[in-house]
Design a protein with these regions (language model features):
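Cytosolic regulatory regions of ion transport systems
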Residues: 1-151
Length: 151
């Protein structure tokens, strides 16, 4: 499977490592070369400095026709723009944008963009933990995934 990850923060780097370790073709883009310090020395994918919202940069990086495109920067708008470019111009199989503002999820879904909102996931995980009580619960709360996409 070919994956393109825009944003090599903690989430992007962790996913890049995990997918690369499963023998997938992984391309990671970030505007800062320092971000690639989060990747291990054994990282089997490509790390490319560039703007993940720029169609030409994405094409040169080999993103066209990727099976999965993950936009994981800290900016909702940047992630949605990158996912739109990937879907509309690069014919990727699936595109997901990480967002922080849950209010925007519905609007992005109307555009056909799948989103993962860490704000909603964290709130849901805490609510689930509190509603179940703490007896027998693990010290680490596992997130409940929420992916919003147009049906």
């Amino acid at each position: 499977m070919k994956l393109v990850i825009v944003g090599c923060g903690r989430v992007g780097a962790a996913l890049a490592e995990a997918f690369a370790n499963q023998d997938n073709e992984v391309i990671v883009l970030d505007t800062s070369t320092r971000a690639f310090d989060r990747l291990s020395d054994e990282f089997k994918g490509q790390a490319i400095r560039g703007d993940g919202t720029d169609e030409d940069v994405l094409r040169k990086a080999g993103a066209e026709g990727a099976d999965v495109f993950l936009a994981l920067t800290e900016g909702d708008n940047r992630n949605v723009m990158a996912a739109q470019v990937a879907m509309e111009k690069l014919s990727v199989g699936k595109a997901v944008a990480k967002i922080n503002d849950p209010v925007r999820a519905a609007a992005y879904a109307e555009l056909g963009i799948a989103t993962v909102c860490r704000t909603t996931m964290l709130a849901d995980a805490i609510l689930a933990f509190l509603s179940l009580g703490s007896s027998g619960m693990p010290a680490v709360i596992a997130p409940v995934p929420h992916v919003h996409a147009e049906a």
